[in-house]
Amino acid sequence: MKTLLLTLVVVTIMCLDLGYTLTCYKGRDRSSETCRSEQELCCTKTWCDQWCQDRGPRLEMGCTATCPRRMPGLDFTCCTTDNCNPVPT
């Protein structure tokens, strides 16, 4: 009886969708954020402003549901694994 109960518990756990959540870097300090269930991508957005020559490109990082389309002056990089969006070099 105990074996049957244990088997049922193991099968139940294996069949459940345990709700994997993605984590993405959210800033230059490499802190991570847990993405909402509908956000299945990590994204890094870079662009230049008037101080780009002195300070380097501006940067936004985090979770997203879709990878934005490329636009003039903006660069997007998207990926699908935990913390796969490091600060560009």
From Swiss-Prot:
It is found in: Secreted. Pfam families: Toxin_cobra-type. One of its GO terms (molecular function) is ion channel regulator activity. It comes from the Eukaryota. Disulfide bonds join 24-42, 35-63, 48-52, 67-78, 79-84. InterPro entries: Snake_3FTx, Snake_toxin-like_sf, Snake_toxin_con_site, Toxin_cobra-type. Its main location: secreted. GO terms for cellular component: extracellular region. SUPFAM superfamilies: Snake toxin-like. Expressed by the venom gland. Binds with high affinity to muscular (alpha-1/CHRNA1) and neuronal (alpha-7/CHRNA7) nicotinic acetylcholine receptor (nAChR) and inhibits acetylcholine from binding to the receptor, thereby impairing neuromuscular and neuronal transmission. Negative results: does not show binding activity to the acetylcholine receptor of an electric ray eel nor lethal effect on mice. This is Long neurotoxin homolog Pa ID. The lineage of its organism: Eukaryota, Metazoa, Chordata, Craniata, Vertebrata.
